[in-house]
Amino acid sequence: VFQFLGRIIHHVGNFVHGFSHVF
């Protein structure tokens, strides 16, 4: 379960990081 949540947090973190570079 924690690995699943970790993967989601990791993907969300990458998405936010990439999204912040757009602007």
UniProtKB/Swiss-Prot annotation:
Which InterPro entries does UniProt cross-reference here? Answer: Clavanin
**Biological role:** Has antimicrobial activity.
User: What is the protein name stated in its UniProt record?
Assistant: Clavanin-B
Modified residue Phenylalanine amide is at which positions?
23
Tell me where on the tree of life, at the top rank, the source sits: Eukaryota
Any one biological process term the GO annotation gives: defense response to bacterium
Answer yes or no on keyword Secreted: yes
Question: Which Pfam families does the record match to this protein?
Answer: Clavanin
Source organism (scientific name): Styela clava
Q: Which UniProt keywords apply?
A: Amidation, Antibiotic, Antimicrobial, Secreted
Tell me where in or outside the cell this protein is found: Secreted
What does UniProt give as GO cellular component?
extracellular region
